[in-house]
A protein has these predicted regions:
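An acidic/histidine-cluster motif and surrounding catalytic segment
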Residues: 1-88, 92-221
Length: 221
């Protein structure tokens, strides 16, 4: 089963935050995960060309950097050879049984998925009344709900992207006009998901928490 379960984790990493990288390296070792840190496009190194798609009066440089790194991850996912591709931001803390729970829960993931959100960012959850015993993967609508935030995303701290999802995202991004990104990453991604009518799922219970929300880290944005 382990041999067939090929997954790579792409980490959206701001390089000055070395303690975050070290913490995650230990986590990946503990859970036997293949990983790749996305370290290009730090906020200090962004070119005018990189920034063309942003309205920089509305999106600060650290968020521009964050979004560009997510886009870079989509490009890698589109072309990689792994069955599953996971994007993590560098402030995440993995569940103690992360690998086993992920392997087990992914057996329920429908093949039509574009994204699967697995973390509890912003403390967004499928309401208990909508959950079913032994069901770990839930379809998530793309519109705003009282319980589900601004749309399909929880935050962009931990989510899987399928090859077809990554391909749609990369194609969409190549058509963006100058100054068209005017929102933080999770709000922008909600808009893209609606524009592309992507198929979105949430995992319950979640298996990733954000270190900036627990107080382990200060926010880097």
């Amino acid at each position: 089963d382990h041999a067939r379960f090929t997954l790579i984790a792409y980490v959206i990493h701001y390089t000055p935050l070395k303690e975050r990288k070290q913490f995650l390296l230990n986590e990946f070792y503990k859970h036997s995960l293949i990983y790749h840190f996305i370290e290009d496009y730090d906020r200090e190194n962004l070119s005018d060309e990189n920034l063309k798609i942003f309205n920089i009066n509305k999106v600060n440089l650290s968020m521009c950097s964050n979004i560009i790194k997510h886009i870079h991850a989509y490009k890698k996912i589109k072309n990689n050879d792994y069955k599953y591709s996971l994007i993590l931001e560098d402030d995440v803390i993995l569940d103690q049984e992360f690998g086993d729970k992920l392997r087990k829960n992914l057996k329920q993931l429908p093949n039509d998925y574009d994204m699967l959100f697995i973390g509890n960012g912003s403390n967004l959850h499928i309401p208990l009344g909508r959950r079913t015993p032994f069901k770990f993967i839930y379809k998530k609508g793309r519109e705003r709900t009282k319980w589900g935030g601004n749309g399909a995303t929880r935050t962009t701290d931990s989510y899987l992207v399928s090859k077809k999802g990554a391909t749609k995202l990369v194609n969409y991004i190549t058509t963006l006009k100058e100054g068209s990104i005017q929102l933080p990453s999770d709000w922008w991604l909600n808009q893209v998901i609606r524009d592309l009518t992507l198929e979105i799922y949430w995992m319950e219970p979640t298996i990733v928490i954000q270190g900036t929300e627990t107080g382990k880290y200060e926010s880097s944005h």
